[in-house]
Amino acid sequence: FNEAGDMPGKIREYCKKTGQKIPETMGAVVRAIFESLALRYRWTAEKLEELTGKKYSTINIVGGGTKDELLCRFCANGTGRTVVAGPVEATAIGNILAQAVAAGEVSGVEEAREIVRNSFETKTYIPAEDLREGWDKAYARFCELIG
């Protein structure tokens, strides 16, 4: 899916080739994209845990994706981890705070993080336990498909 073009068509073709249900509507295509993102987030979190020997119970999502509640819910449910979404304008905030640190107005990363925590709203998404089994099955299939 790295090359530009008819992405819904490419998704449908991939689903057909791999024996998955083919998304017929644009809504079904979007759902397939969001589900695969959530499952890839889980895969990535598990790989990070293997590499670092640490457990990560929370995923922070920043930027424009935080405005999509369905994506955030899928991320929480698909990963089995709490998701903290926000702030939306993370790039601009980070830029300003990096300049403030460089100018000596902010002491460092910890103070900058505290400023963000105290200045911007976030929304927390908790994984729905009643959906766990379905997401686990989807994840097992996802892992088979990606090798």
State where each predicted segment sits.
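Short, electropositive, low-hydrophobicity segments enriched in small/polar residues
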Residues: 67-69, 98, 108
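A generic secondary-structure boundary signal that marks alpha-helix termini
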Residues: 46, 104-105
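Short, hinge-like loop/turn segments at secondary-structure boundaries
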Residues: 78, 101-104
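Activation-segment/catalytic-loop signature of the eukaryotic protein kinase fold
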Residues: 1-93
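Alpha-helix boundary/capping detector
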Residues: 6-7, 101-102, 142
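Acidic, glycine/GT-rich loop-and beta-edge segments that sit at the periphery of enzyme/chaperone cores
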Residues: 105-147
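Short, small-residue alpha-helix embedded
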Residues: 92-102
